[in-house]
Amino acid sequence: MFVKLKLIFFFFLLCQIMISSSQNLNFTYNGFHPPLTDISLQGLATVTPNGLLKLTNTSVQKTGHAFCTERIRFKDSQNGNVSSFSTTFVFAIHSQIPTLSGHGIAFVVAPTLGLPFALPSQYIGLFNISNNGNDTNHIFAVEFDTIQSSEFGDPNDNHVGIDLNGLRSANYSTAGYRDDHDKFQNLSLISRKRIQVWIDYDNRSHRIDVTVAPFDSDKPRKPLVSYVRDLSSILLEDMYVGFSSATGSVLSEHFLVGWSFRLNGEAPMLSLSKLPKLPRFEPRRISEFYKIGMPLISLSLIFSIIFLAFYIVRRKKKYEEELDDWETEFGKNRFRFKELYHATKGFKEKDLLGSGGFGRVYRGILPTTKLEVAVKRVSHDSKQGMKEFVAEIVSIGRMSHRNLVPLLGYCRRRGELLLVYDYMPNGSLDKYLYNNPETTLDWKQRSTIIKGVASGLFYLHEEWEQVVIHRDVKASNVLLDADFNGRLGDFGLARLYDHGSDPQTTHVVGTLGYLAPEHSRTGRATTTTDVYAFGAFLLEVVSGRRPIEFHSASDDTFLLVEWVFSLWLRGNIMEAKDPKLGSSGYDLEEVEMVLKLGLLCSHSDPRARPSMRQVLQYLRGDMALPELTPLDLSAGSVMNLGGRDGFSGIAMTDFSTVFKGFTGGSSIADSLLSGGR
């Protein structure tokens, strides 16, 4: 029993000795003379024959590490407290350029023997892009940084900082020391001279002190940098101590001359007289390359910068845009010109869909969404381009109707006006009506298109928040989607006015053959002038003929409204239908009704024309069209159709008296038609 007790006591005493030895670990290197079995060298780190630990050489963008191979028990496993520690060392930095170096040196306490994934340059071999600043690093370091890195908040290119898990220092100061008169003296880290450092951590006050001084000076009374922080959350139980360094683009060498360390006590003083001397540094002689080559390179660089600036300015002008106050509310629908330029492949002629008096239209594919669009680029010679463009933006930007061509957005640059529409794959209606088209529309398709356009025009007149006068209803402005549904487009001539107010338009704008007589006289556009144009459109779709045709051979002018009206007077109105429709397979009564409705909408008296609400009722069969009956036409009454010889003063029998039940009065339309707006 006594023997067992003696063995237990001996084992306990041995453990205490080992713990005490670990808790008071210390070592001193007055130079690093090979072989160094207890120091691990990594990266560029080597030992010179005279005992200098050379962390880096003149290689660029490299790291060098030197760590003591013995693990040090920094933290008490029972209470979690970090032990006090102290270290002192002497280092020097040699640079090929006296005023510039890269990138510095750091004393490190790390959880691993080396830092294999650390980066060079501004990361000083401590961290990389992904782990910089992570709490899981468990790295304490004091950096002696010779390059200012703004991303880490460095104050300058000659500073000392305390780093905890990252390169954004917890505290820092310009490198220097306070002399015996308490006056701060700057100290250049790249002076090519030996510099001595003291780093102390007190586990009771949790104070970290970093003191710096020239090689041959005593330790200053005041530290350069201090910081209070309990390192128990930073350091693990077992850690390694050592140094890290890194190079950047400037050729630099980092030397460690001597080093001592102690746990739970003050680090032993270095024997300065025994420390190895630095290699003699001689400045390089300026070669012929620097005398001749550098000026040539500089000159080439200047020309390159000028060319680059010219290219940037030219490119900026190429995609330059304009933005005015009125565009603010439509900002979300604004396209960049660069995007439209690439979408249309530079507005190539092969992507040109059409060209008119108001502008040219190009097919394009938006790079981001791959959406097919039609980009209308307004011609430079458009006299009222800006006004028309603004009207279009305001009227279409917020509209949403299945029979209107959606306006996706717009762009403006240096006087150019661009509108971006949803692309309609089947193009405009007119190409299916004239010039022997390859594809002929049957009556069902034409009827669907007519009803769709009527619905869209009714939306503009009565269903939207403001009255919108289209002013250019015609077959070429009706676009067909993939299912041959008619969509009313080209709002470049649209005008808005509030419900109940007079339209303030004074310019005669539109297309010959679709202009109402009163529009030619007064220059004012109203919903009734749109109805007149829609009447011409109805006759156009049913007959397959243009509202006006000039025959140069006979010097005659064909007026579609006049022709259909004359056929109706003779009782042969069905002769006006398009021969391509054939004679069967569709509702002939519906065709006749549409022709008569076209005449009614083309009435010379705007009060006699139906509203678009009534037009829809007729087309949908919700209300019967009033019967048209010829009366005595010998009274000589005439109507101005706005069709021939400048569309003023065309004599034509006035059929305002041929409708059954016509009595005249303040509202002719109300006496003729039921319903209303």
From Swiss-Prot:
Task: Name the EC number(s).
Answer: 2.7.11.1
Provide the residue span(s) of the region labelled Legume-lectin like. Answer: 24-262
* GO MF annotation terms: ATP binding; carbohydrate binding; protein serine kinase activity; protein serine/threonine kinase activity
Active site per the UniProt annotation: 472 (proton acceptor)
One Pfam family in the UniProt entry: Pkinase
Q: What Gene3D superfamilies does UniProt report for this protein, alphabetically? A: 2.60.120.200, Phosphorylase Kinase, domain 1, Transferase(Phosphotransferase) domain 1
Task: State which ranges are Extracellular (membrane side).
Answer: 23-291
Domain Protein kinase: where?
A: 347-625
Q: Could you give one GO CC term from the UniProt record?
A: cytosol
Q: How does it sit in the membrane?
A: Single-pass type I membrane protein
| One of the GO biological process terms | pollen development
The protein's UniProt keywords, in alphabetical order, are: ATP-binding, Cell membrane, Developmental protein, Glycoprotein, Kinase, Lectin, Membrane, Nucleotide-binding, Plant defense, Receptor, Serine/threonine-protein kinase, Signal, Transferase, Transmembrane, Transmembrane helix
Q: Which residues cross the membrane?
A: 292-312
Q: Cite the binding residues for ATP.
A: 353-361, 376
The record places the following residue ranges in the Cytoplasmic compartment, namely: 313-677
The disruption phenotype is:
Male sterility due to defects in pollen development leading to deformed and collapsed nonviable pollen grains. Increased susceptibility to the bacteria Pseudomonas syringae, characterized by stronger necrotic symptoms.
Q: Which family does it belong to?
A: In the C-terminal section; belongs to the protein kinase superfamily. Ser/Thr protein kinase family. In the N-terminal section; belongs to the leguminous lectin family.
Q: Return the protein name.
A: L-type lectin-domain containing receptor kinase IV.2
The organism encoding this protein is Arabidopsis thaliana (Mouse-ear cress)
Q: The organism's lineage?
A: Eukaryota, Viridiplantae, Streptophyta, Embryophyta, Tracheophyta
Task: Report the gene name.
Answer: LECRK42
